[in-house]
Amino acid sequence: MTIKNVICDIDGVLMHDNVAVPGAAEFLHGIMDKGLPLVLLTNYPSQTGQDLANRFATAGVDVPDSVFYTSAMATADFLRRQEGKKAYVVGEGALIHELYKAGFTITDVNPDFVIVGETRSYNWDMMHKAAYFVANGARFIATNPDTHGRGFYPACGALCAGIEKISGRKPFYVGKPSPWIIRAALNKMQAHSEETVIVGDNLRTDILAGFQAGLETILVLSGVSSLDDIDSMPFRPSWIYPSVAEIDVI
């Protein structure tokens, strides 16, 4: 297989918090110097592409904001294909910005969708409204299934849990491991799955999403998953490396 396109996860692969993984800059610049289409993909919906580019620049890694693709962007792309343009949103600036760009009206009056991302201001009233709207027919869409991040701060999946319990309806999660976000990233690059590799640190999200979308997969051991985890999974990554610094197949 000749790799012509690269999708790469961010946290645990290229960054640890706000510190670059050793070799990350060289890895990314090597891909860009070869002219390969690149998407840096994250499940977290709370930052814009420019926010992420600034985060990388602060860590000494210069990449354009155009290479970033977040679950908020993917959610907006998903919703562009659906009927209805009114949404009740549990989320913050980056998600709301993407929804406005997609032509949505943000409202708490008869919404077509309840869209959940991530926010630190989640409260009883938000949960009540979201559950009420979902129980009464609003379509339940969420950016990503992650329940928590580093330090156990609640993430989108945790915010959805109460709404799901009250309404009896499960959300459609746009982010990994859903193959939908991978196909959306491929569309962004105008790429084909059989010519694309995804690099990730999490077997249950990055590698599973790539596997389900028909991509070659690279697991790096600088983040969530370890070699011991591989034996518990029904699928295997195409390649395994200690970190991006050692990847030699791209």
Curated annotation (Swiss-Prot):
What is one term from the GO cellular component aspect held by the record?
A: cytoplasm
Identify the cofactor(s). Answer: Mg(2+); Mn(2+); Co(2+); Zn(2+)
Task: List site positions: Confers substrate specificity.
Answer: D146
Name any one GO molecular function.
Answer: phosphatase activity
Q: Which CDD domains match?
A: HAD_Pase_UmpH-like
Q: Where is this site: Orients D-11 for proton transfer during catalytic turnover?
A: R55
Reactions listed under catalytic activity: a ribonucleoside 5'-phosphate + H2O = a ribonucleoside + phosphate
The reply on keyword ATP-binding is no
EC numbers listed for it are 3.1.3.5
Give the InterPro entries listed for this entry: HAD-like_sf, HAD-SF_hydro_IIA, HAD_sf
Which of this chain's residues are annotated to bind substrate?
D11, T42, N43, K176, N202, L203, R204, T205
Q: How does it assemble?
A: Monomer.
Give the similarity note. Answer: Belongs to the HAD-like hydrolase superfamily. NagD family.
Name the record gives this protein:
Ribonucleotide monophosphatase NagD
Q: What is the lineage of its organism?
A: Bacteria, Pseudomonadati, Pseudomonadota, Gammaproteobacteria, Enterobacterales
